[in-house]
Amino acid sequence: MKKLMAANWKMYKTPQEAALTAGELVKAVGTVPDDREVLVFPPFVGLAQVAQAFSGVAGFYCGAQNVYPADEGAYTGEISPGMIVSTGAAWALTGHSERRSVLGESSAFVGQKTAFCLEKGLNVVLCIGETLEEREGGQLEKVLRGQLSEGLSGVPAGIAPERLAIAYEPVWAIGTGKVAGTAEIAATHAVVRGMLRELLPAAADSMRILYGGSVKPDNAAAIISLDNVDGVLVGGASLQAESFSRIILA
């Protein structure tokens, strides 16, 4: 299975800046190693530009940071899977903790998005993760199981495993500079793999589980070498081509 090296650019970069960084990234990486794939989630307004920069370049893909589970309609401010596909993007991100906490998205709604995207031909990275209070309160497995079971509730049992990835992002490690220890990461990813075997047994062992949370060039190699870590989802360190290329090639 290829490691999925993903970047979430959040609400940064104009279309022009996104195109420039995407082009710089292609040059900095050169040929993507056979065991890697690169996936960038720019803001909506930069999707077409990043897709164009990656067009015809093996191993580079882009996706949307959000999606609405309908083909079209009176949903002001929202974007449909078809609109995303029309830009040249192939992926969508669902369940990110910032959308759960800041915008109040429930796990049930995340599940609707995930299932609808897969039905409409978009691949999905589904994010899960606990707060520090939940971890310290012994709620880690309960929280992750709830997010996974609802997030995957509409996913068909026969889903092709390469079309769906899980990103485990401990909320307390996102943008804080705090990183879960390698033992913590490995243990939690093993728990997630076990849950996937219960929920999607046919696909579970071939699905990629990414780690996210203050991933940087100097810790990426140690993280992606762990059992059940099949890539990373990178925030701040992905905004510059130089640093993200080092993570991709770590």
From Swiss-Prot:
GO molecular function, one term: triose-phosphate isomerase activity
Gene designation per UniProt: tpiA
Pfam families: TIM (PF00121)
Membrane-crossing residue ranges in chain numbering: none
UniProt record, GO biological process: gluconeogenesis; glyceraldehyde-3-phosphate biosynthetic process; glycerol catabolic process; glycolytic process
Family statement: Belongs to the triosephosphate isomerase family.
EC number: 5.3.1.1
Superkingdom assignment: Bacteria
Keywords for this protein: Cytoplasm, Gluconeogenesis, Glycolysis, Isomerase
Organism: Oleidesulfovibrio alaskensis (strain ATCC BAA-1058 / DSM 17464 / G20) (Desulfovibrio alaskensis)
Signal peptide, first to last residue: none
Protein name, UniProt field: Triosephosphate isomerase
